[in-house]
């Protein structure tokens, strides 16, 4: 790529934001070695060996370190490594990598997910991360979680799909969901969604994007960030 094109590309808002986040990760690093030292190494190796020959798609998560590195970036991009202790709820928490890092940084954490993948339960136990077992469905409120949260997050989840048709939620479903999250969000709390792309490559319809914006979100492709709570 010619230098002029590289410079032009970097001046684009999306490219600039992503470049700035990468720079910030280098300026304010989060060492993983002390966190890995907190893990029972023998048990971690047992889990890895248990799934080493598995053809299941989720078996890749048994190799812990790459997923900790990915989730370290998520923590850094939300500035939670430079934050006072917060109460964090992660929807679709999977194996708990994101929450494990936050716990080691002094935050109070809770995951919410279905109990369909045994590996995730093993990882959560290894990490000492609490999970509430619950399936998120359209037009159904979340359970009473006993507290409100300063942050509610969700990364690469599929709760906003109807199964088995894999049809995505519309504006009515999302609006109900956001209104319900409001009850679980502490005053001044924040919400972040990292959405999966649909089969056509998009992340949401124009109508859903408009809904996110009307509720106070900053929308950057797959990144939906309500930095000052929800607006109704």
What are these regions (language model features)?
Residues 64-85:
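Conserved alpha-helix/loop element of class I SAM-dependent methyltransferases that forms part
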Residues 85-94:
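Conserved class I S-adenosyl-L-methionine
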Residues 95-105:
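Conserved SAM-binding loop of SAM-dependent methyltransferases across substrates and taxa
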Residues 128-139:
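Conserved SAM-binding strand-loop segment of SAM-dependent methyltransferases
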Residues 142-152:
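A short acidic, Gly/Pro-enriched loop at the edge of an enzyme's catalytic core
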Residues 151-171:
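A short SAM/SAH-binding and catalytic strip from SAM-dependent methyltransferases
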Residues 168-187:
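A short glycine-rich, Lys/Arg-flanked "PGG" loop and its adjoining helix->strand segment in the class I
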Residues 188-195:
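Conserved beta-strand signature within the Rossmann-like core of class I S-adenosyl-L-methionine
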């Amino acid at each position: 790529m010619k230098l002029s094109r590289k410079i032009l590309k970097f001046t684009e808002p999306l490219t600039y934001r992503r470049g700035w986040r990468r720079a910030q990760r280098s300026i304010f690093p989060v060492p993983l070695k002390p966190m890995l030292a907190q893990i029972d190494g023998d048990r971690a190796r047992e889990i890895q060996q248990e799934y080493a020959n598995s053809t299941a798609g989720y078996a890749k998560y048994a190799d812990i370190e790459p997923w900790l590195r990915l989730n370290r970036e998520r923590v850094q991009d939300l500035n939670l490594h430079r934050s006072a202790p917060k109460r964090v709820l992660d929807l679709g928490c999977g194996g708990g990598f994101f929450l494990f890092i936050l716990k080691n940084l002094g935050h109070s954490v809770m995951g919410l997910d279905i109990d369909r993948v045994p590996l995730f339960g093993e990882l959560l136990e290894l990490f000492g991360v609490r999970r509430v077992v619950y399936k998120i469905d359209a037009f159904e409120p979340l359970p009473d979680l006993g507290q409100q949260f300063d942050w509610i997050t969700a990364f690469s989840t599929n709760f906003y799909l109807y199964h088995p048709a894999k049809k995505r939620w519309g504006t009515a479903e999302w609006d109900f969901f956001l209104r319900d999250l409001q009850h679980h969000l502490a005053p001044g709390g924040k919400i972040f969604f990292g959405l999966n792309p649909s089969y056509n490559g998009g992340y949401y319809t124009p109508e859903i994007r408009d809904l996110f914006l009307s509720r106070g979100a900053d929308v950057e492709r797959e990144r939906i960030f309500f930095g000052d709570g929800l607006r109704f």
